[in-house]
Curated annotation (Swiss-Prot):
Name recorded for this polypeptide: Ferric nitrobindin-like protein
Species classification: Bacteria, Bacillati, Actinomycetota, Actinomycetes, Mycobacteriales
Annotated stretches, region: Disordered: 1-21
Family (UniProt): Belongs to the nitrobindin family.
Alphabetical list of Pfam families matching this protein: THAP4_heme-bd
Length: 228
């Protein structure tokens, strides 16, 4: 998965018979999967006095009106991707849960696991949790279109991204602040691009600053909608 593919989003294949066939096939697969994913949601305890988190827009609280530009992200996403580490490239599996409770933020939880050459589980890998929201600044309407993504990583660092929607189905963010714990790994800032691509899948590309100070490819994945 490349940055261009994610940036262009859904409906980007070339206008050719081959492209049209690919698009039709992707739409058919997406429609087929949606009949299953539409009936799924994340588990919830029904004895709490607060609204339950939901990853299915058909259930639970209404999505906060300030988050409509992020609506396509809500759901449970599963798939595979490729990463680059100190020991070379590797494959990983991943699940991302994007939920809400009616508040002015989206809950974000991503966990991944390394895969061996046979595509089977090898070991746990990266995990992060956090929140998406839009900046609210009544004195600067343009700034109010900015996205905040606050993440805590299991590797021992906290990261704040800022960004903007590129269009109705893709979002680009860049690290603004980074803090590592005493036991955490040392990492550089990152740039992430998320997009809904052909077939309704969620794809992303992450580039991260290396020891030489330049952005280099770090992670990329394409995930299908499992729930929502």
């Amino acid at each position: 998965m490349t940055s261009d593919e994610v940036r262009d989003g859904a409906g980007s294949p070339a206008d050719s018979s081959k492209g049209n066939k690919c698009t039709a096939a992707g739409m058919f697969q997406a429609a087929k999967r949606s009949t299953v994913s539409a009936a799924r949601n994340i588990p919830a305890f029904d004895d709490l006095p607060v609204p339950s988190d939901t990853a299915n827009l058909r259930e639970g609280a209404n999505l906060n009106s300030t988050l409509l530009a992020l609506l396509p992200l809500v759901g449970v996403w599963r798939g595979e991707g490729e990463g680059r580490g100190p020991n070379g490239d590797y494959h990983f599996g991943q699940q991302i849960v994007v939920s809400h409770d009616g508040g002015n933020y989206l809950n974000w939880e991503a966990r991944s696991w390394r895969l061996n050459d046979a595509g089977e589980y090898q070991e746990t890998s990266l995990r992060e949790t956090g929140f998406w929201r839009f900046v609210s600044d009544p004195y600067d309407p343009t700034e109010s279109q900015a996205i905040e993504l606050l993440l805590a990583h299991s590797a021992g660092y906290v990261e704040l991204f800022y960004g903007r929607p590129r269009n109705a189905s893709s979002w680009e963010l860049v690290t603004d602040a980074l803090a590592c714990s005493k036991s955490g790994v040392l990492v550089g800032g990152a740039k992430r691009l998320y997009g809904i691509v052909e077939g309704g899948d969620l794809a992303y590309v992450e580039e991260r600053v290396d020891a030489d100070g330049g952005l280099v490819p770090n992670l990329s994945a394409r995930l299908y909608r499992f729930a929502g």
